Amino acid sequence: MQVSPRRNAAQQSFRTLFTLALLFLVPIPSRAVIVRGTVTDPLGAAIPGARVQLIQGKTSAGSAIASPDGSFEIRSTASGRFVLLTSAATFAVNIGQNFYGGRTDLITRNPTLEIASIVTQVTVTATGIPTPIQQASSAINLIPFSALQERVGVIDDLRQSPGINAVQQGQYGGVGSIFVRGGNSDANKVMIDGVTSEDVGGRFDFGTVSSTALDGFELYRGPNSVLYGSDAGASVVNFTTPRGGTLKPVLNYSGDAGNFHTYRNEVTVGGTHNRFDYYGAFSRFDSSNALPLDRYHAATSAANVGYHITANTPLRFTIRNGVSATGAPNAHDFFGISAAAKQADQDLYSGATVENRYHEKWHNLVRYGIARKREQFTQFYPVGEKIPVFGFDTYFGNTVTIRGANGYSATGRGAINYAGVYPQGNDQSSLRDELYFQSDYTFSPHFVGLFGFRYEDERGSYNNPGFFQFEKIKRTNYQYTLQFQGDLFGRLFYSLGGAIERNNLYGTAGTPRFGLAWVPVRPGNQLFHGTKLRANIATGVQEPSLLSEFNSLYKQLSDAGRPDLIASYNVHPIQALRSRSYDIGVDQNIFNQQLILKAGYFHNQFSHQLDYVDSGTLKTVFGIDTSTAFIYGALLNTLAYRAQGFEGELQYAPNSHILLRGGYTYLASIVEQSFSTDAAANGTSAQNPNLPGIPIGSSYPLVGQRPFRRPPQTGFFSALYEGTKWTAAFKGAFSSRADDSTFLSYSDINGDNTLLLPNRNLDFGYAKLDAYGTYAATNHISAFAELGNLLSQQRIGPVGYPGLPFTFRTGLKIRVGGD
């Protein structure tokens, strides 16, 4: 049967209309960005009814109301950079970090709302996964970007945390160190944007770190070698670089000047463009300091560039370069003159990171990082008066009286330089390439697992032509980490992990960690509503430094070609330095989430630490005769000490404009075992003839005494005000006296020990007060001033090294562009 053309055309028209109807009636995938997640409070409880807005620029691209389980989903046909604005009754508004979303992307964001007016705080250092600080079992302090805006460096803000004693040896550019809960100054893992940044062996100079291009930093108190491997024996310090966040480019300039010929210029630029975000900074700081031959300058440059391959696959590149040079006047108060020397440093840190989140639950990260650290010390010419001592020409300083905080004093002339060919000096380098892989999977909102792998290629060198030392090392290290974290009933939070590290020098080490946080009373606006009890048990491991390896007994016997002595005395390579810690604490909301108390007890045991053992002690105590190898002493893992104490912090925010903080730490530390020359002789090997019968540790603390530079009492406070036009801050740091040494053994004009003083309470206590202020004349121009060390106390550092007196800086900030 033949179909008429008219009927055939009608059938085709019907099919066309039917197809068009299906296009409208049947749902098909649309080109829309989808943002979904769950709104919770800091303890993970869902917040139903929360309003979530997707903001693009100054307009709303979509919104949603959280369901009874806190979940939400927003669809928008827009693409580009977005911010989530989340609000709910009785909670503070949360403004999230900006992110990129394409029209076909599915993005997960989980906002956390705080009950208090205090800004939401999230830690990454504690567990490797972004975690609200209220769920963390660890002792953590977050120093925000706002605290660093008027600062030159970071030393003063490191003091604004319990358990930390920050020591700077001298003035601007002087070596800066931290001793955390009694740990050594090289037992701290330092990271910049996730890249390991300390020297091989843990040494890190905080004195040359500029505040330029720092978005803040995280202070984790306690060992965490599970996540970060070697050197995280006492703490972890994590610096971060800002990211561009404005749709339009923004340029910031800051310039200031002050006394002691101090001036500083800083320029930053940042912004976003579609998939890109970018930030760059450069600064230059100069000062003559308050001592002769102690001029300091530092130039810092940094960049942070991100690109979203997809919304869930960002790629990020960071780089930070610091170049500095400072005079090295030595311990000026011991000699009355400054040494003619210079210390130069070139430090570069960089990393490239790619991460991906697959189906909301599976997150993977790969980071390649480098650290290139080089330093040179140069003594240009000898200073002082040349006087022969025991047939050798020695240069002595002026006649001075050295006074300790313990009431003892010594008068004389100390040896500041020795005969030789000038200029002379040494140089060293510490180079590291590392690859880090992390994979974490959220099995449920209450259980997360993490696996990590870290590879390190470390190289180092030390060259001292004057002593014919030309040393090089190479180490290849691996680490495997497995960690689980979660919660039970939204009240008991746990973190359990372990790591196995294979170090090229000391072999294999295992480091477990376990943490618990229990919230018996959930946070609220009532009196005493909000109680968290926390506890941690952890071990840490630290690899020896380059110089420690060079001076170990095993290395010296190997270099001397004496494998027979190594075999006869069963001498091993230098071992890992160990730490073991447990701490308990409570975080208590006292009133309306405005007055919060944090208090805790910690107990640390540091073992297998390093002693310098002379040849006589090697023979009499250990039965090792090194006379035929012409070895006069070596480093051994024979030192052990304990450090325990209490730390507390009180925070009060009466309103959104004022924040008051204060903290206190009591530290009881004691050397339990030592075979150093001083300890083996009970402090009589280098006794001051003018102080007969008083034992002195000339270079190392004695058994039963406190380790050097660990004051038993430290504290801090800060008062911050932030208004529409005015911002002001008043901060202080306090310390009691600490044990130390003048380190002037056999250094007086007769080659004797009359310039040594008893160790107990040798370093002075201090109170350092600083004030800052900023006035915003317009949205683009503001003026600021910094008043440092208001009491002009110069005995803030170790004995013999005077700090800066009262200082001031004042300048302008100019902002161009931005949203």
Positions of PLM-derived features:
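Short, acidic, small-residue-rich periplasmic hinge/interaction motif at the N-terminus
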Residues: 40, 51-53, 87-91, 102-148, ...
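Extracytoplasmic beta-strand/coil segments of soluble accessory domains associated
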Residues: 155-196
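Short acidic/polar hinge/loop motifs at secondary-structure boundaries
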Residues: 156, 195-221, 301-303
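A beta-strand signature from Gram-negative outer-membrane beta-barrel systems
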Residues: 161-162, 209-252
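Transmembrane beta-barrel wall of Gram-negative outer-membrane proteins
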Residues: 259-286, 291-326, 341-370, 442-453
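Membrane-embedded beta-barrel scaffold of Gram-negative outer-membrane proteins
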Residues: 276, 361, 365-369, 373-377, ...
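Structural signature of Gram-negative outer-membrane beta-barrels, strongest in the C-terminal barrel
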Residues: 442-446, 454, 470-596, 600-604, ...
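Gram-negative outer-membrane beta-barrel transporters
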Residues: 487-494, 603-605, 625-744, 779-782, ...
